């Protein structure tokens, strides 16, 4: 049991070190030797868990997917309105990126052309599905104008979430993501939400930003 626990801890250490390097330097610019040095483990320990760098990348994207689904599931369990669930989801994903390198590295790997192994969905496809379902629900609940093109808005929202992180990677720290997410919603709420319902969701976005900043 103790040996198994140490092995799991070593695996986690290696994944975290790899995620940090992939996030900061990219997949192609990071070698297994770099990861070994950053994780402070032996090459034998690394190869015990991962036969190749691609296996590490896949493990990171798998963890990112699990975290995103967990955040979405926890929000769904609250039973809140669809638009509130969508806003909370985007801030939840921003928080994952602020708190650790796994989410940030997973995104960089996806935008860097690293292959996603089935049955794991591509991160952008998964995000599009999470967003589309909640947008559709918000239209039915009259929190979003009925004539909105849900597919177009969902695609634009995915591009915003991904693009903000890609651009911000070289321009500002990950801690800026909650602010950028709040700015996104200030624009979207004005364009999508009927006037009487806007104050509620503007207030929600501002509150979620404050909560993340206070927590980290």
Regions found by a protein language model. Give the residues of each.
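Basic, helix-initiating cap at the start of DNA-binding domains
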Residues: 1-25, 29-41, 54-58, 67
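Base-recognition residues in the alpha-helical recognition helix of bacterial helix-turn-helix
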Residues: 23, 47-51, 63
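Conserved hydrophobic residue
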Residues: 28, 144-145
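Key DNA-contact positions within bacterial/archaeal DNA-binding proteins
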Residues: 44
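Hydrophobic alpha-helical connector segments
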Residues: 59, 66, 70-99, 103, ...
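Short secondary-structure transition hinges
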Residues: 91-144
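Hydrophobic alpha-helical segments that form the core
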Residues: 92-94, 146-167, 176-191, 206-210
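C-terminal peripheral helix-coil segments that are non-catalytic and often amphipathic
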Residues: 125-129, 133-141, 171-216
């Amino acid at each position: 049991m103790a040996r198994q626990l140490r092995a799991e801890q070593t695996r986690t250490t290696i994944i975290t070190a790899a995620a940090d390097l992939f996030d900061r330097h990219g997949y192609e610019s990071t070698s297994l030797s770099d990861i070994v040095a950053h994780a402070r483990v032996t090459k034998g320990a690394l190869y015990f868990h991962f036969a190749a760098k691609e296996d590490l990348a896949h493990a990171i994207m798998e963890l990112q997917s699990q975290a995103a689904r967990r955040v979405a599931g926890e929000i769904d369990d609250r039973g809140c309105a669809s638009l509130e669930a969508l806003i909370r989801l985007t801030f939840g994903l921003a928080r994952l990126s602020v708190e650790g390198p796994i989410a940030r590295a997973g995104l960089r790997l996806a935008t860097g052309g690293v292959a996603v192994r089935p049955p794991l969905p591509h991160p952008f496809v998964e995000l599009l599905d999470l967003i589309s379902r909640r947008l559709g629900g918000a239209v039915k609940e009259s929190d979003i104008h009925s004539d909105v093109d849900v597919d177009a808005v969902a695609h634009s929202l995915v591009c915003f979430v991904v693009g903000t992180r890609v651009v911000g990677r070289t321009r500002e720290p990950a801690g800026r993501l909650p602010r950028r997410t709040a700015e996104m919603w200030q624009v979207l709420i004005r364009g999508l939400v009927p006037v009487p319902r806007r104050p509620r969701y503007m207030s929600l976005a501002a509150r979620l930003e404050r909560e993340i900043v206070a927590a980290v």
